[in-house]
Amino acid sequence: FDRVREILSGNPRFQKIHALKPVTLDVKKGEVLGVIGQNGAGKSTLLKVLARTLLPSTGEIEINGRVAALLELGASFHPEMTGHENVYLSCAIQGLSSQEIDSVYGEIVAFAEIGEFIHRPVKTYSSGMFVRLAFAIATHIDPEILIIDEALSVGDGAFSRKSFDRIMDFKNAGKTILFCSHSMYQVEALCDRVVWLEAGAVKKIGEPVE
């Protein structure tokens, strides 16, 4: 009956949990940093903090350059708006002018490969369609920093390979990339360094082959 007494008394005994403990991390311009760890290790929290979609309770973050982040599935989309409308909204939020959005719109739609669904509300999209459009937007707004959280694990194999090739193009162009994946093959092929998180803390930072 302890749980009942807690509810009735209005004095529940909750334990404070730190999703991410103090982290000191420098990422160089043009570097590709992998983020690995088990589920619940703090990977997504770290990327959200770096993308500034989540404010840290303590500490400081310094980011230089436009950031494009592909985090929670469809988090940046308005569900009632069409894919077309969400492209313009997402790009405008990133600071692109109407003319700049017009110039990349065709490339975004072509890369996403969702056909006539671009004119339908995104609430009707499958998870694969969400990530196709979100990835296409994130990689066509010319960011200096690209943050990707498990995006390539959603959708079909052909689009995953196409997306990975697109990320490699970013790497070859000298863009800074933070890449979270459970695929060590992708991490080893793409990343210059890897940060290994465990229980919200950095366990090790080193090269992917270590």
Q: What are these language model-derived features?
A:
Residues 1-21, 208-210:
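Pre-NBD coupling/linker segments of ABC/ABC-like ATPases
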Residues 2-8, 88, 100-117, 134-136:
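Conserved ABC ATPase "signature" region
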Residues 36-38:
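The feature captures the beta-strand-to-loop junction immediately N-terminal to the Walker
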Residues 183-189:
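Conserved H-loop
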Residues 189-196:
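Conserved catalytic segment of ABC-fold P-loop ATPases
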Residues 199-200:
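Conserved ABC ATPase "signature" C-loop
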